[in-house]
C-alpha cells in the first residue's frame, strides 16, 4: 500500500507541472520600457485591468514570441536582478506551492523520497522554462 501513495503523489506532481507548463506556453508575454513601466503594468493587472489596456497605459507591449524587443527590455523589477534570481525564485515558489501541499496530504517515509523527486522536477521546470527577456502577462 505504501508504494501506491508514493506513485500517486509523483503523478499528482507531474500533472500539476504539466498544467502549469501548458498555461505558460499559451499566454502572451509583456515587455516594458523600464522598471517604472513594469511596476505600473503589474499594478494595473493586479487591479483587474486587461492586458491590452494595461500595456497601453504603462508603456509596455504584449508579444507572442520568447524575447522582448531591445527597446522594451524589462522583466526584472530590480536592476541587479538576473537569471539566477529568477530561477531560484521560480524553484522556491514551485516547491512551496506544489511539493509542500503534497507533504500536507501524504505523510510517511516514502514521502521524503517523493519530496525529493518533486523538488527535482521543480528545478528542471524552472531551469528549462526560464525566459529572462519577458514575463507572463
From Swiss-Prot:
Locations listed in the record: Secreted
Gene Ontology biological process terms, A to Z: defense response
Purpose of the protein: Thionins are small plant proteins which are toxic to animal cells. They seem to exert their toxic effect at the level of the cell membrane. Their precise function is not known.
UniProt entry tagged with the keyword Cytoplasm: no
GO molecular function, one term: toxin activity
Protein family per UniProt: Belongs to the plant thionin (TC 1.C.44) family. 4 C-C subfamily.
Protein name: Leaf-specific thionin BTH6
Signal peptide from the UniProt entry: 1-28
Gene Ontology terms: cellular component: extracellular region
Annotated PROSITE patterns: THIONIN
Amino acid at each position: 500500500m505504501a508504494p501506491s501513495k508514493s506513485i500517486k503523489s509523483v503523478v499528482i506532481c507531474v500533472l500539476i507541472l504539466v498544467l502549469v507548463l501548458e498555461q505558460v506556453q499559451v499566454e502572451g508575454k509583456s515587455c516594458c520600457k523600464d522598471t517604472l513601466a513594469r511596476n505600473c503594468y503589474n499594478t494595473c493587472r493586479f487591479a483587474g485591468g486587461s492586458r491590452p489596456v494595461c500595456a497601453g497605459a504603462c508603456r509596455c507591449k504584449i508579444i507572442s514570441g520568447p524575447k522582448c524587443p531591445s527597446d522594451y527590455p524589462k522583466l526584472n523589477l530590480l536592476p541587479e536582478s538576473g537569471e539566477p534570481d529568477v530561477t531560484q525564485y521560480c524553484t522556491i515558489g514551485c516547491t512551496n506551492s506544489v511539493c509542500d501541499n503534497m507533504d500536507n496530504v501524504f505523510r510517511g517515509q516514502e514521502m521524503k523520497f517523493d519530496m525529493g523527486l518533486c523538488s527535482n522536477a521543480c528545478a528542471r521546470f524552472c531551469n528549462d522554462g526560464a525566459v529572462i527577456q519577458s514575463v507572463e502577462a
